[in-house]
């Protein structure tokens, strides 16, 4: 009986996957129309992004690109997420956004967005890189295919 329980626990432990320290989810909101031809998940995401925007101008300012960053790191460390990106109209200039993460939490979600006037004037994001640092040291990094 004990042997069976030990084998079962060993099998369950072998099936568990390691936790990724950094995961990125991208979404581009291109138009305000909710088409029936869209996938239900896309329809829901559009509705979520446009929620609360009443006027046409408010809805237009929500158009652009959204990056949701899911992170896992040591709770005691001083953590920061750095989002570097290049836009179509800015040439080779690299722009940067930073978010300090609360000490004491070991996981969470941060969102970066390039929307509204920034999106319309400078164009869409062509390449990006996101780094997760803990105590000043990079512990995880993800980037788009075009990032150099």
Question: Locations of the language-model features?
Answer:
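Extended, low-complexity, turn-rich repeat/linker tracts enriched in Gly/Pro/Ser/Thr and Asp/Glu
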Residues: 73-77, 120
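Contiguous beta-strand segments within globular domains
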Residues: 38-73, 109-114
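Short glycine/proline/serine/threonine-rich loop/turn segments at secondary-structure transition edges
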Residues: 119-125
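Bacterial Sec signal peptide processing site at the extreme N-terminus
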Residues: 15-32
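Sec-dependent bacterial lipoprotein signal peptides
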Residues: 1-16
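Extended low-complexity, serine/threonine- and proline-enriched intrinsically disordered segments
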Residues: 77-95, 130-132
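Short proline/glycine- and polar residue-rich coil/turn motifs
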Residues: 100-108
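Short beta-strand elements
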Residues: 138-148
């Amino acid at each position: 009986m004990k042997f069976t329980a030990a084998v079962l626990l060993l099998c369950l432990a072998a099936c568990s996957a390691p936790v990724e320290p950094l995961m990125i989810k991208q979404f581009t909101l291109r138009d305000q129309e909710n088409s029936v031809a869209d996938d239900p998940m896309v329809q829901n995401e559009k509705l979520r992004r446009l929620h609360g925007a009443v006027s046409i101008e408010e809805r237009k300012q929500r158009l652009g690109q959204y990056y949701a960053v899911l992170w896992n790191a040591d709770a005691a460390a001083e953590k920061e997420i750095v989002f570097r990106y290049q836009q179509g109209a800015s040439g080779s200039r690299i722009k940067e956004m930073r978010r300090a993460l609360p000490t004491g939490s070991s996981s969470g979600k941060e969102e970066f967005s390039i929307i509204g006037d920034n999106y319309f004037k400078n164009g869409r994001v062509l390449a990006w890189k996101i780094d997760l640092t803990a105590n000043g040291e990079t512990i995880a990094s993800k980037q788009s295919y075009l990032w150099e």
